[in-house]
UniProtKB/Swiss-Prot annotation:
Organism lineage: Eukaryota, Fungi, Dikarya, Ascomycota, Saccharomycotina
Protein name: Putative uncharacterized protein YIL032C
Basic residues biased stretches: 61-70
Residue span of region Disordered: 49-80
């Protein structure tokens, strides 16, 4: 199941690449569990740091020599520039009319409103 979700995200990411080469936005996929009508959510924050790209490439080809990127002076980054991570979802999901969901995330007081993918 997780592999299928990852494949969907990969396809979507390839499709929605913008001109700067960074990936856009936040992908939210929902799966409806038919037995108890609860939603499980998969959050993927698609902005990835350059270091993460280089380390993942090095892990894929362990025999290749890892080429380190040139060191640059640290700039003042905005607080929302994070590498990829998964948000944990607390069991507080409210189903609204027309398949609109509000999902409260345990990492902050923020909530996401999104349409469920059937």
């Amino acid at each position: 199941m997780k592999q299928a979700i990852r494949e969907k995200v990969k396809k979507k990411r390839r499709r929605e690449k913008n001109t700067s080469g960074k990936y856009k936005g936040l992908y939210i996929l929902f799966r409806l569990a038919a037995d108890d009508f609860t939603y499980s959510a998969f959050f993927y924050l698609s902005k990835r740091s350059k270091e993460e790209h280089t380390t993942s490439a090095a892990n894929l080809h362990p025999r290749k020599k890892k080429r380190m990127p040139p060191r640059r002076a640290e700039k003042n980054k905005a607080p929302n520039h994070h590498p990829s991570f998964f948000l944990r979802v607390i069991p507080a999901t409210f189903v609204l009319p027309d398949n609109i969901l509000i999902i409260l995330c345990s990492d902050s007081d923020l909530f996401f409103v999104a349409e469920a993918i059937s």
